[in-house]
Design a protein with these regions (language model features):
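Cysteine-centered iron-sulfur cluster-binding motifs in ferredoxin-type domains/subunits
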Residues: 1-7, 18-37, 242-260, 274-293
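A contiguous binding-surface segment within folded domains or other stable secondary-structure elements
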Residues: 99, 256-266
Length: 338
């Protein structure tokens, strides 16, 4: 709801999002905003966009033009429904693929476009991406101008050559064609080997994460993450929590976590509450449901801790603090006549 600039999304009495089509402009800005991938649009696919970007980079293009639907005469490159559909996770993933400059063609035409909100929503996305880049070494630059088309100048007319030199030069097209064919075959093999598929769950946690976040986590090892804490951003839902001594290992947070980021394991007579950094989306359900107020969210997250992909202990709950089951031994047994 906060992402929609047209106020076209509200919550119904069951607390489920409801779209008011009369107010919706179709900018698709809500699609990347949902941390659960609950909102979809056929024209928005992070996987398809990254796949196309990878192909262009493999062809030697690190400077890519992306046109929206407002552009009628587009330059060669990629296309999106509206520039409102961008999010920091996809931008970072494109940087990991080798994209260095992203030209957003048509972003200056939003006022006359039915979608209308591409430019305003992209401004917030760029701010979030700039914040994310403080924690990354590899990043791309965003341009609001279309990529310039370089017109190759015609080659000067060559002077007549000696007969022997002309013979060997005549072999060049044949050799070039053979090399191009070999390169094409190699390229096709590489493309097939590196084709970007919809992420399959590597772990139990991955299956509960939004696709764009899975793509970002897979790109993260190539982005040179540093230890600058990244604040929580709804556009890139990565969260972190900590526990205090009031924890009784009651298991309610584990049961409520939609991404299985929390778990409790036994350690002798004690129990340990564990946290999986790469599975938390910062939804705060665990915090809101904790009966002891033993959990709180951290203001930032360290991306290298996410790279470890290992659960870390939050707190050890000693035996005397464990939530006990009600003792029914002293209750009188009910007789059938009762």
């Amino acid at each position: 709801m906060d992402r929609c600039p047209a106020d076209a999304i509200t919550l119904n009495p069951d607390h489920a999002p409801q779209l008011h089509t009369s107010a919706c402009t179709g900018c698709t800005g809500c699609v990347p905003a949902c941390p659960a991938d609950a909102i979809e649009h056929e024209a928005v696919s992070a996987v398809s966009l990254l796949q196309q970007a990878r192909q262009l980079v493999m062809q030697g293009q690190s400077e890519i033009n992306v046109a929206c639907n407002a552009v009628t005469d587009t330059h060669p490159g990629l296309s999106v429904h509206c520039h409102a559909s961008w999010n920091p996770a996809v931008l970072a993933s494109m940087a990991a693929e080798g994209v260095r400059i992203l030209h957003l063609e048509g972003i200056d035409q939003c006022n006359g476009c039915p979608a209308h909100h591409g430019s305003s929503l992209m401004q917030q996305t760029e701010k979030d991406y700039a914040t994310l880049n403080k924690s990354l070494g590899i990043q791309l630059h965003i341009s609001h101008k279309a990529k310039e088309i370089v017109v190759e100048k015609p080659l000067p007319v060559a002077e007549p050559e000696p007969q022997r030199r002309a013979f060997f030069r005549s072999l060049i097209p044949t050799l070039t064609q053979g090399a191009a064919m070999a390169a094409s075959q190699i390229g096709q093999a590489v493309n097939q080997a590196t084709a970007l598929e919809i992420p399959e769950a590597d772990t139990e946690h991955d299956s509960h994460l939004p696709v764009r976040l899975q793509l970002f986590l897979r790109a993260l090892p190539r982005l040179q993450a540093n230890f600058t804490p990244m604040p929580f951003m709804p556009s890139l839902p990565l969260g972190a929590i900590q526990a205090n001594a009031r924890c009784t290992a009651c298991n309610q947070c584990v049961e409520q976590c939609p991404t299985k980021a929390l778990d409790i394991r036994e350690f002798g007579a004690n129990k340990i509450l564990e946290f999986q950094p790469d599975a938390c989306i910062g939804c705060r359900q665990c915090i809101n449901t904790c009966p002891e107020d033993a959990l709180e969210s951290l203001p930032g997250i360290s991306l290298p801790s996410v790279l470890t992909q290992r659960a870390r202990p939050l707190i050890m709950v000693h035996e005397d603090m464990l939530k006990k089951e009600p003792d029914r031994s002293d209750r009188p047994e009910l007789k059938e006549d009762d």
